[in-house]
């Protein structure tokens, strides 16, 4: 295969590529979704050129595959991202993300009085889309927050 361009982030033989992440969000996704909890090699591209959005972030995780549920949780902060499954340097499956109905054990409730801060329970939020905005409702305190507020709470 001849190419007239050079990859800015090295190709992987087998694993997951999360592409079209909004610029400045890649590191947050790595920590929020515990994508670094692996011994496998992770390659990160930040502020890469993008025809679609000007700039983007990119994450490649070797020998690791995200489930569709895990991938859809990324849609909260990277709604236009794609998750590609790579095998032998080829894309064998491409997931287009959609918002999940709920997200569990990932985010922290911004309400400091919520029991999820003091009790041994995993956080749990119902995902609601209202007039183009994403809101999260905590299962425990039942307060509703703009998803950006929850992102900043972590």
Curated annotation (Swiss-Prot):
Cofactors needed by this protein, per the record, are: Zn(2+)
Instruction: Please list the residues that bind Zn(2+).
Output: 109, 114, 138, 141
Q: Which UniProt keywords apply?
A: Metal-binding, Pyrimidine biosynthesis, Zinc
Q: Which GO terms describe its molecular function?
A: metal ion binding
Tell me how the cofactor is bound. Binds 1 zinc ion per subunit.
| Domain of life the protein comes from | Bacteria
Q: Where are the transmembrane segments?
A: none
State the GO CC annotations.
aspartate carbamoyltransferase complex
Q: Which family does it belong to?
A: Belongs to the PyrI family.
The role this protein plays is: Involved in allosteric regulation of aspartate carbamoyltransferase.
Question: What PANTHER family is this protein classified in?
Answer: ASPARTATE CARBAMOYLTRANSFERASE REGULATORY CHAIN
| Subunit structure, as described in the record | Contains catalytic and regulatory chains.
Its protein name is Aspartate carbamoyltransferase regulatory chain
Taxonomic lineage from the root: Bacteria, Pseudomonadati, Pseudomonadota, Gammaproteobacteria, Enterobacterales
């Amino acid at each position: 295969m001849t190419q007239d361009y050079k990859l800015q982030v090295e190709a992987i033989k087998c694993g997951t590529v999360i592409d079209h992440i909004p610029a400045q969000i890649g590191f947050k996704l790595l920590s929020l979704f515990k994508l670094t909890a692996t011994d496998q090699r992770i390659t990160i591209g930040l502020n890469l050129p993008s025809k679609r959005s000007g700039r983007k972030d990119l994450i490649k995780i070797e020998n690791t595959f995200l489930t569709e549920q895990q991938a859809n949780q990324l849609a909260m902060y990277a709604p236009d991202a794609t998750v590609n499954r790579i095998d032998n340097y080829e894309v064998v499956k491409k997931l287009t993300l959609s918002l999940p109905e709920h997200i569990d054990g990932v985010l922290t409730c911004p309400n400091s009085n919520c029991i999820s801060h003091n009790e041994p329970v995993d956080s749990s939020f119902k995902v609601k889309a209202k007039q183009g905005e994403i809101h999260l409702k905590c299962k425990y305190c039942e307060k509703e927050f703009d998803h950006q507020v929850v992102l900043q709470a972590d």
